A protein has these predicted regions:
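Short beta-to-alpha linker loops that shape the active-site pocket of alpha/beta-hydrolase fold enzymes
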Residues: 105-110, 173
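Short, surface-exposed "cap/lid" segments of acyl-processing enzymes
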Residues: 56-106
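C-terminal motif of bacterial Sec signal peptides marking the signal peptidase cleavage site
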Residues: 16-17
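Serine-hydrolase catalytic core
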Residues: 63-67, 212-354, 359-379
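Catalytic nucleophile-loop/oxyanion-hole region of alpha/beta-hydrolase
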Residues: 111-138, 143
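Active-site nucleophile loop of the alpha/beta-hydrolase fold
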Residues: 169-179
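Gly/Ala-rich beta-loop-alpha elbow adjacent to hydrolase catalytic centers
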Residues: 146-150, 154
């Protein structure tokens, strides 16, 4: 999810019927879908580096195949403003354990933020529906995974399709921590942007994600959250679920997510990884595994919404990676120091501490341990 200095806002439960500005690839096999999406990106993207080929591949749907016959499949869905790069590491980890893994690109993403002005939740759902069905035709057992908004989308699909074997939910955006997100559907037509685009201060995008999103993007995020909560209220979800959240997430109502896990995700083999101070529920619930998220030896003040996904070895987002996110809710002089390559600490959006410059935490020091917990859940 993208942050704004201005409050994000709104709730109407009917979906907008707007058409996307971009032509969507038709329903096809995955290889054709990927090639058509690559062409769409190439035609519409505002490239951020001189290496257009790399940017195309980073933003396009990906597939990882295991050695030998796959024992199952996993479809992974990114979040608002993100791209398939979100699963660069997790995809490889799962494929190494025998799964065929695929990612999708949600409409409006991977090109330029303006292309989200008219996108709809229904279009996002269509991509998930088509590619989940395609994967189900190819392997006997399919799991779905999602990050943030993507977690809402796969939860919705799983509630409608009992053949889905389980879920992997990374920072699931069941409920925002903003009291105003419900307003965004009402104001998107009069205020297309919550943060003015191209203001000379706030970057619009990086090679792999947007840093500014139209109001309509937040509106569709809101709709997906409402839908996820409706599904959870419908009935408990009884398949194995792996979930991971951080206490200091600047996007989510993490207490609501924790309570949802304890009350609605009932499989005894499900696990929730919680980064932060051990929640009160953890001692009573062996399914909740807590780890400290203050790691001063690594200059980590707190974990972030997005950092849970990435290995420290990630070539873009690791501590030695090429994509340091300095737009992190701090004063402009601190942002300039970060961009100049000075030593930094890491945090989620908006955290400040005297005498320290904070970049966004974009890697997870517990990645290997977290992956083993995830794989154990898949083995249920």
């Amino acid at each position: 999810l993208i942050h704004s200095h201005l409050p994000i806002v709104l709730c109407a439960l009917a979906l907008q019927a707007c058409a996307s500005r971009l032509d969507e690839p038709p329903a096809t096999g995955f290889d054709s879908y990927r090639q058509q999406t690559l062409q769409l990106i190439e035609n519409h993207r505002v490239f951020q580096t001189a290496d257009r080929t790399a940017e195309l591949n980073w933003n396009a749907p990906q597939q990882w195949r295991p050695n030998g016959t796959p024992k199952g499949g996993v479809l992974l869905v990114h979040g608002l403003g993100d791209s398939p790069w979100s699963f660069h590491d997790i995809g490889r980890t799962l494929a190494d354990q025998g799964y065929i893994v695929r990612t999708v690109l949600l409409p409006g993403h991977g090109t330029r933020p303006q292309d989200m002005l008219n996108v709809t939740l229904a279009q996002w759902q269509q991509v998930v529906r088509e590619q989940a069905a395609q994967l189900s035709r190819e392997v006997p057992k399919v799991y779905l995974g999602g990050f943030s908004t993507g977690a809402n989308l796969v939860l919705d699909y799983a509630y409608q399709h009992d053949d889905i074997a389980g879920l992997l939910l990374f920072s699931p955006a069941f409920r925002s921590d903003s009291a105003y997100v419900w307003v965004t559907p009402w104001i998107s037509w009069v205020r297309p942007w919550l943060a003015e685009p191209d203001d000379g201060v706030r970057p619009m995008q990086t090679p792999v994600r947007y840093l500014n999103v139209p109001t309509n993007g937040f509106a569709q995020f809101h709709y997906s959250s409402v839908l996820a909560r409706q599904r959870l209220e419908q009935k408990p979800y009884g398949k194995p679920v792996f979930m991971v959240i951080t206490e200091h997430d600047s996007v989510l109502d993490t207490r609501y997510v924790l309570d949802s896990f304890n009350q609605r995700f009932t499989h005894p083999g499900s696990r929730l990884v919680w980064y932060g101070t051990s929640p009160q529920a953890a001692p009573q619930n062996p399914r909740v595994l807590a780890r400290n998220d203050y790691l001063p030896e690594l200059h980590i003040s707190q974990f972030s919404h997005m950092g849970l996904l990435f290995s420290p070895d990630n070539p873009l987002y690791g501590p030695q990676g090429s994509q340091r996110i300095c737009w992190n809710g701090q004063p402009l002089p601190d942002m300039a120091r970060c961009m100049a390559g000075e030593p930094v600490w890491y945090s989620d959006w908006g955290y400040q501490e005297p005498g320290k410059v904070h970049a966004r935490l974009t890697f997870n020091p517990y990645y290997q341990w977290q992956s083993q917990v995830m794989l154990n859940v898949l083995g249920q």
